């Protein structure tokens, strides 16, 4: 069993040892080498180096994957290090492996899969977006430490988010929410051109391992 933590903050000081005592393998995603060292000190088994190219909330991330991955590899003490952030194609996987990654973590590409529960409008935005269309923001940190950065495709009525959230989002509002809220996506979004089965996406990415 694997416990995957997406924030290497102080809570991990207690959570990681408890998980390991229960026989779990602990994987921690970080956006800085300092946080990677903290996770390792607490006993993390696997580190995910999340470059600032990634979509969604970024773990203190302002460092691109090409600089971050070698820095975390240097302090990993032989632990596997996975690469995350903007990875979409076999070429991206191959580049990460050449830098020394043991594997990759992929998000946005699987939003654009047939099996994904993402709203159809969200999927369409991903297909339409170019690499230039994502933005690095700190304004949507609800439920996270204030100011936590994230990467999104901004939507046309993005500034209405507070009114929508304050009023409560009902199931019937899903179309409206998909049109108004910023949508999490990484910088690799410009290389996603079709909705395909997840297995096809995995097969494409796996070609980068050889």
Segments (PLM) and residue ranges:
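Active-site entrance/lid segments in N-terminal catalytic domains of soluble metabolic enzymes
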Residues: 1-78
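Acidic, glycine-rich active-site loops and adjacent beta-strand->loop/helix elements
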Residues: 53, 86-87
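Conserved active-site-proximal phosphate/metal-binding subdomains
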Residues: 58-82, 88-210
